[in-house]
Amino acid sequence: MKTKIKYLRQEMGITQKDLAEKVGVSRQTINALENGKYNPSLLVAYKITQLLNKEHIEEVFVFEDEEI
């Protein structure tokens, strides 16, 4: 999954550490999300979306087509 977290976070002047603390995850988790190495739970995705002042998860997370 690709994300726009890094771009949006930097645009708002928020560090990985600050975002992690507000979401309730580690800084390493935010780093993994930004690098596409971790798929968040729906709750974490929702919290990040709210904290980045977006209304829709799709504005932050780009879901890639996966074969089932």
Where are these regions (language model features)?
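Short basic helix-loop element that most often maps to the first helix and adjoining turn
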Residues: T3-K22
